[in-house]
């Protein structure tokens, strides 16, 4: 979902200010001191909150695409696709900076109540986690780029369901955050155990092949690094789920003890 540019938030316009000079023009400089009606403040805050949500949803979508594309690049040893994933990280960083700027402006100009403030700060923290997830996807793509042209490979069947689950986890936890859905957040966190199981399976399978065939040590190491980055994505998702639980309950809880 794209964020929309807005202009003039917080401005109070006198309907006669465009006319001839006189007492009205003399007071134009003081218009910004006139308090806005409460419903205008609330409407503006709603717009700002909506833009922050849109930015987080956009980041989540970009990161999800990155994970799946990085996996495809690894599976097919596609250097061009891997490079595309690596380059696209800049777009995620741009969205993060935009969201952070909106959060800062909203806090400074709208004086949100405690619950809205917690929500805004949580969304800002989540953009950091999503940015790091994007970095992990980029790291998977870098391993894929290094494997381009390699003819001797190891078996890593469990990496595909691992990448698919990691992408799904990102999508689900972002939706849980936007809706402040505690139940969904807990379900997402619980599924991290499956990512861990798949990671250990990949690790055991690849290590076994590396031990029996020295030619597979280098490609096997690349696959193990890729699996590690996917496992780290799962941990980052759990961090976001913990933020959702805090927003819903006010309690700080470790969902990955």
PLM features per residue range, with description:
Residues 1-257:
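Cytosolic, long alpha-helical scaffolding segments
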